[in-house]
Regions:
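Flexible loop/hinge segments at secondary-structure junctions
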Residues: 1-155
Length: 155
């Protein structure tokens, strides 16, 4: 919501002890088109931030906060291209695209308080639910309670 604006913010530094972070402004890169990736990402943000939920919400397209510090990109290609082009930026793409294109990604702290990387095992942990409770073909499995769950998952 624009509360952390530089990479060396004390809250980021506390999560990265011993890492020299630049005193540079953060530019966020988001999807400029509607996408399921945006829905899953904003659904997660809505679950972990009541501020995000009340002001932005979860959808395939949203009005991104702090627009002056963000750049839009069409599709995974546009987002990844802008992240690579714009210094000190961060964005989101689907895991398969990141893996196929050898993009860097981060660990996230999940609901259980554990820092995990996105991979097959953390996706499996997130999807380890009672599927009988979810009629239909899709379920949002963001921020699941499993100890090793990747927090931004969908099935």
């Amino acid at each position: 919501m624009g509360k952390i604006t530089t990479w060396n913010d004390a809250r980021i530094q506390a999560l990265n002890p011993g890492v020299a972070l630049p005193a540079a402004k953060i530019t966020t890169v988001n999807r400029s088109d509607g996408s399921g990736t945006t829905f899953v990402f904003t659904n997660y943000l809505s679950q972990v931030s009541s501020d995000w939920k009340s002001k932005v919400g979860a959808d395939k397209t949203v009005k991104w906060p702090n627009a002056s510090a963000s750049v839009g990109g069409k599709g995974n290609e546009g987002v990844s291209s802008n992240v690579q082009r714009v210094a000190n930026s961060i964005g989101y793409v689907e895991y398969a695209y990141a893996k196929q294109n050898r993009l860097a990604y981060t660990q996230l702290q999940n609901r259980a308080g554990k820092f995990v990387l996105p991979d097959d095992s953390t996706f499996a942990a997130a999807s380890n639910i009672n599927w009988a409770q979810y009629p239909g073909f899709a379920v949002t499995i963001t921020n699941m309670p499993a100890a090793n769950a990747w927090p931004i998952s969908a099935a």
